[in-house]
């Protein structure tokens, strides 16, 4: 699936209500999640209730990014679907691609991604805190 969104993509079948969440999102912003379903199956909506995903491409609007991330986690763990993408849709129709930003999910290794707070040795090679107790040196230095 490309990093652009097709707004004519079919939505999952959902018989319930979002509790007014999307009415407020129409004047501010809303989020869209897209994925490719392997078959028609029921899934739990982040807003409550269940919906039936379609076989093939699906597009679902939600009011919060956290709801999209929760649904993405469910798609990944229960349905083994890893091609979901999250977009921010502004009221003027502008669409911004959000997740995964560089095409690789945060928990995966990406050759171009800089490591943050990483130590180049195993935990067994950590310094003993007693050895540096009365020195002006921290255990993480």
From Swiss-Prot:
InterPro entries on file: PsaD, PsaD_sf
Pfam families, per database record: PsaD
Function description: PsaD can form complexes with ferredoxin and ferredoxin-oxidoreductase in photosystem I (PS I) reaction center.
Gene name linked to the record: psaD
Domain of life of the organism encoding this protein: Eukaryota
UniProt name for this protein: Photosystem I reaction center subunit II
Keywords on record: Chloroplast, Membrane, Photosynthesis, Photosystem I, Plastid, Thylakoid
Cell location: Plastid, Chloroplast thylakoid membrane
Recorded family membership: Belongs to the PsaD family.
Topology of the protein relative to the lipid bilayer: Peripheral membrane protein
Transmembrane domains' residue ranges: none
One GO BP: photosynthesis
PANTHER family noted in UniProt: PHOTOSYSTEM I REACTION CENTER SUBUNIT II, CHLOROPLASTIC, PHOTOSYSTEM I REACTION CENTER SUBUNIT II-1, CHLOROPLASTIC-RELATED
CC annotations in GO: chloroplast thylakoid membrane; photosystem I reaction center
């Amino acid at each position: 699936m490309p990093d652009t969104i097709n707004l004519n993509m079919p939505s999952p079948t959902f018989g319930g209500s979002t509790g007014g969440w999307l009415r407020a999102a129409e004047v501010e912003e809303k989020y869209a999640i897209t994925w490719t379903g392997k078959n028609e199956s029921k899934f739990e909506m982040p807003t409550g209730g269940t919906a039936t995903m379609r076989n093939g491409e699906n597009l679902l609007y939600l009011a919060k990014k956290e709801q999209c991330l929760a649904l993405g986690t469910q798609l990944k763990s229960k349905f083994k679907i890893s091609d979901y993408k999250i977009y921010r849709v502004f009221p003027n129709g502008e669409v911004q691609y959000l997740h995964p930003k560089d095409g690789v999910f945060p928990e995966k290794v990406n050759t171009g991604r800089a490591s943050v707070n990483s130590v180049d040795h195993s935990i067994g090679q950590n310094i003993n805190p007693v050895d540096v107790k009365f020195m002006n040196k921290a255990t993480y230095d």
